């Protein structure tokens, strides 16, 4: 499904509640294997930019793209005026450098070089001022090819096309030895003048001539020979020659000019326009006003052009991948109109391809993906048979079909080959500076990148087959972090995970992005703490939580030390409880459910372990029109759907063995409460200390497990009725947010300890609560979300 369609869906979520909305209020998909692993059986997202980049690998133009420092550091969000200024600055800088070189090489010989350079600089400044909206006449210059070029440039900026053309044509009439530096520039600009005059055949000739002159040895300091491909492509497109424009845009892209990704959309006859985007035809608002007759004529025009495209190998490939990149998957119901539009477009293209009776179809596997996306698996197999079968896309499609046939082993082996090709193929690796390609490969979250989906599929297959360590390896190296974390925390044994982490190569932290090795080490450290393997855990925790662990372990030991007094032991248990409550996420929190450290505890994550144990997942119930229904509270009604990728008996056994205890969100709060109750057991009845400790334990657990909270309240009722805090609790019939002698001391000690080890105070919403010292039984919500 296209990213644009998903964007529409996201905008409309509040109205139609589509996509991965869970009963918890968590919006996804953020976990690839969620929703019963349906992604593993579904079609991956195809990206226009990535696919045309793959096709461009078949083109090998000899020219080199010249990229200025400013262009390399361009910000996609900056205003067009700022980008234009950067281009102008680069032209000015290059012009000045070329003039200096011409003087040094004695290609021009002014009597006063310094004066000539100053005149040249002033002329360039005049051109820049004119370009910025302040018309400025050219000053007198030393007579040379540079001055001749400037005359044409000044006329061009004033939109005096005839004068500009005459100036540059006169420049090209000079002897070759007198125009080494501005021959290519003049030819290129003559092409742009012809575009302005709508003389597209002449423009085409000049852009071709630009490349010929650069190849002949004339200076091309701005890389205009490379740039000419895109402009010539535009000239051919203006002449309605898509079969000529497409390879020119492809050469432009092959040279590294990503703007060709947008230009190539112009050669797609039936591309749907989108509001707010660059469209090559009538805008959406205009189309909405069309009569039925106008719509019929447009469809006829599109069909005729598609038939022409079907006969051209390159255009045929482009139309196919464009349909894939914009298709709406059948299991998404954003609007019925969008769904029908996707199906009709695909069906029309299939009919045209079949009518063309072609002897050979390049990239037939991509036609297979269109069929697969529509649920026509027989058709997908047909197109797959017509393909060479050795591309990543072909192998991936084959693996999907094998999975549907229940051939898990074959599907896993085939998918493994597909992923390996993606790792090594130039078509699926980014050139330096191609952030857009990197995103299409590895994007995660609201949509999945191509390579991310491949890793997710292979990881899911490995998991379903019981290849647990291999599943972790694929998901981890594919940077599907939440999925890898699930396997690491809930499927692997602790020793298996430790062995895997210890075998990771020592690498420098990445300059950008997340350090996944570090994240996995920290995940292991917290799991070891949950397993009470404190000595092992210390080296894996992120500093300074290794020091927090030391303090926590000492408190546990002191609490259990019967040689100490009851008061000393109680203090120790309460210190351990305080640390478990307020540093519990960092010490022992789970990366995924139930604690959601991956989301900083701010959102409840889908419980993949529960889902895979049950063999089903919950999703919103839609009717045939794609509408959701709601209960009396306004929540969408859910339905249970059988999992696509079912867990093996071996996996279920491990999921049961590796349960989080207690399996409750922020489970460490229950641990903190239990530790506090150990302290309470050592304190005398009806002391303010015991009331304080039990009340704190109740405050920590009351929103997590009401039954446990009720048990703690009974202790207040039986042991603390004569205390101020106990009386406040009894008056409220529940716990109160109130400070006592020990909680005040622990809070102060905790803050001092954090300062000592260099931990910044947490955000206000997550800080240790300022407990009320007043005995009044007023309630307040627990201030910490964790």
Predicted stretch roles:
Residues 1-9:
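Bacterial N-terminal signal peptides that target proteins for export
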Residues 21-170, 175, 179-189, 202-786:
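Extracytoplasmic/secretory-pathway proteins
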């Amino acid at each position: 499904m296209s990213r644009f369609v998903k964007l529409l869906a996201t905008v409309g979520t509040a109205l139609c509640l589509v996509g991965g909305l869970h009963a918890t209020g968590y919006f996804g998909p953020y976990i690839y294997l969620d929703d019963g692993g349906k992604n593993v059986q579904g079609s991956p997202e195809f990206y226009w930019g990535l696919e045309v980049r793959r096709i461009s690998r078949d083109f090998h133009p000899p020219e080199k793209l010249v990229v200025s420092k400013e262009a390399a550091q361009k910000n996609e969000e900056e205003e067009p005026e700022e980008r234009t200024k950067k281009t102008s600055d680069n032209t000015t800088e290059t012009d000045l450098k070329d003039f200096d070189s011409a003087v040094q090489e004695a290609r021009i010989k002014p009597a006063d070089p310094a004066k000539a350079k100053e005149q040249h600089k002033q002329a360039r400044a005049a051109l820049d001022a004119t370009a910025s909206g302040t018309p400025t006449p050219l000053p007198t210059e030393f007579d040379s090819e540079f001055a001749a070029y400037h005359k044409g440039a000044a006329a061009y900026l004033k939109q005096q096309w005839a004068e500009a053309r005459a100036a540059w044509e006169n420049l090209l009439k000079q002897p070759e030895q007198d125009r080494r530096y501005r021959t290519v520039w003049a030819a290129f600009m003559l092409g742009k003048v012809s575009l302005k005059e709508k003389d597209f055949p002449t423009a085409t000739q000049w852009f071709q001539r630009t490349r010929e002159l650069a190849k002949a040895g004339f200076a091309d300091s701005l890389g205009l020979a490379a740039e000419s491909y895109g402009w010539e492509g535009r000239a051919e497109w203006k002449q309605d020659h898509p079969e000529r424009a497409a390879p020119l845009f492809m050469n432009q892209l092959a040279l590294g000019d990503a703007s060709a990704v947008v230009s190539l959309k112009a050669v797609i006859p039936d591309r749907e326009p989108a509001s707010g985007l660059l469209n090559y035809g009538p805008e959406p608002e205009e189309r909405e006003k069309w009569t039925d007759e106008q719509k019929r004529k447009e469809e006829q025009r599109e069909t005729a052009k598609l038939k022409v495209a079907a006969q051209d190998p390159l255009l045929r490939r482009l139309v196919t991948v464009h349909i894939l990149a914009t298709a709406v998957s059948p299991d998404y119901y954003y609007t019925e109109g969008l769904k029908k539009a996707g199906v009709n477009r695909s069906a029309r293209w299939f009919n045209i391809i079949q009518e063309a009776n072609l002897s050979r179809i390049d990239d037939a596997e991509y036609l297979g993906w269109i069929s697969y996306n529509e649920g026509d698996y027989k058709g997908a197999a047909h197109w797959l048979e017509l393909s060479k079968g050795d591309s990543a896309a072909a192998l991936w499609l084959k693996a999907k079909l094998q999975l549907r046939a229940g051939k898990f082993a074959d599907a896993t082996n085939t998918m493994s080959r597909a992923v390996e090709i993606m790792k090594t193929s130039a078509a699926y690796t980014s050139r330096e500076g191609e952030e857009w390609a990197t995103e299409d490969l590895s994007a995660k979250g609201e949509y999945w990148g191509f390579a991310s989906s491949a890793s997710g599929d292979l990881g899911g297959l490995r998991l379903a087959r019981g290849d647990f360590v291999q599943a972790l390896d694929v998901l981890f190296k594919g940077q599907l972090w939440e999925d890898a974390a699930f396997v690491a925390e809930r499927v692997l044994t602790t020793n298996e995970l430790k062995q895997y982490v210890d075998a990771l190569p020592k690498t420098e932290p990445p300059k950008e992005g997340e350090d996944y090795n570090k994240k996995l080490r920290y995940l292991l450290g917290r799991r070891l703490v949950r397993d009470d393997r404190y000595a092992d855990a210390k080296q894996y925790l992120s500093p300074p939580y290794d020091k927090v662990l030391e303090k926590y372990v000492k408190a546990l030991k002191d609490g259990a030390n019967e040689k100490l007094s009851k008061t000393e032991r109680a203090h120790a248990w309460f210190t351990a409880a305080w640390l478990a409550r307020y540093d519990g996420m960092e010490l022992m929190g789970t990366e995924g459910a139930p604690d959601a450290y991956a989301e900083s505890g701010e959102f409840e994550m889908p419980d993949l372990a529960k889902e895979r144990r049950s063999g089903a997942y919950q999703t919103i119930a839609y009717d045939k029109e794609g509408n959701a229904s709601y209960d009396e509270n306004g929540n969408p009604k859910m339905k249970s759907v059988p999992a696509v990728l079912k867990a093996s008996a071996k996996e279920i056994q491990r999921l049961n063995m590796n349960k989080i205890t207690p399996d409750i969100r922020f489970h460490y709060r229950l641990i903190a409460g239990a530790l506090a109750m150990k302290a309470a057991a050592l304190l005398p009845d009806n002391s303010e200390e015991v009331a304080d400790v039990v009340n704190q334990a109740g405050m920590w657990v009351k929103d997590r497990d009401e039954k446990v909270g009720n048990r703690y309240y009974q202790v207040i009722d039986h042991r603390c009725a004569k205390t101020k805090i106990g009386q406040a609790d009894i008056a409220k019939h529940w716990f109160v947010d109130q400070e006592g002698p020990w909680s005040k001391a622990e809070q102060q000690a905790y803050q001092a300890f954090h300062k000592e080890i260099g931990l910044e105070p947490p955000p206000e919403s997550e800080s240790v609560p300022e407990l009320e010292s007043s005995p009044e039984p007023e309630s307040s919500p627990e201030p910490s979300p964790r």
